[in-house]
Amino acid sequence: MEKFITLFSTAVPLFIDNIDTDQIIPARFLKLTTKSDFGKNLFRDWRYDSNGKIKKNFILNKKKYSGNILITGKNFGCGSSREHAAWAIRDYGFKVVISNIFADIFKQNALNNGLLTIELKKDFINLIYKKIFLNPNILFEINLEQQYVKFENNKELFKIDDFKKKCFINGYDDIELLFSIKKKIEIFEKKNIYN
């Protein structure tokens, strides 16, 4: 997993509530067995028409909106528990998804696959949308160590599980983190279990 401490990036505003995993990555594109190559089908039915032509009005098809941060409406990632949704978002190039609430299974899948999910207050997200539509080039700072999102003179703290935070900062998935403390585990076992 890639280390994540601080990110400076512009953002893509997708102000739609209840985006489910089938909208994120339609089921007909789930036949791959690796985590890569899903990004090209992210929001496929919203980005392209049935003939494969680009829908110019969809936010990801507008050149003025880009970046490594996706800002969404509430209840993002609801629906089925497909891990492919997190893979598609990550493969497309997003490193962070911001919402005021995520579907629980999606949130866990995202965090397990190196996609940081940040829950912020609805008022702060509304402020982001208002500002970003006026200026798509606003630079956001995501600081994981100090757990805040900042843009212009606006700053909001967010919560993250300590274990997941440590994984992101060190670039470990769950198993790699355990291997990183293997010696400590062995010492603990010798002192406490085998006596």
UniProtKB/Swiss-Prot annotation:
- A single MF term (Gene Ontology): 3-isopropylmalate dehydratase activity
The catalysed reaction is:
(2R,3S)-3-isopropylmalate = (2S)-2-isopropylmalate
Give the Pfam families listed for this entry: Aconitase_C
**Record keyword Thylakoid present:** no
Q: In which pathway does it act?
A: Amino-acid biosynthesis; L-leucine biosynthesis; L-leucine from 3-methyl-2-oxobutanoate: step 2/4
Which controlled-vocabulary keywords does the entry list? Amino-acid biosynthesis, Branched-chain amino acid biosynthesis, Leucine biosynthesis, Lyase
- A GO CC term assigned to this protein in UniProt: 3-isopropylmalate dehydratase complex
UniProt entry tagged with the keyword Amino-acid biosynthesis: yes
Name one process (GO BP) from the record. Answer: L-leucine biosynthetic process
Which EC numbers characterise this protein's activity in its record?
Answer: 4.2.1.33
Q: Which family does it belong to?
A: Belongs to the LeuD family. LeuD type 1 subfamily.
UniProt function note: Catalyzes the isomerization between 2-isopropylmalate and 3-isopropylmalate, via the formation of 2-isopropylmaleate.
UniProt subunit comment: Heterodimer of LeuC and LeuD.
Write the protein's name: 3-isopropylmalate dehydratase small subunit
Please name the source species.
Karelsulcia muelleri (strain GWSS) (Sulcia muelleri)
Q: What is the lineage of its organism?
A: Bacteria, Pseudomonadati, Bacteroidota, Flavobacteriia, Flavobacteriales
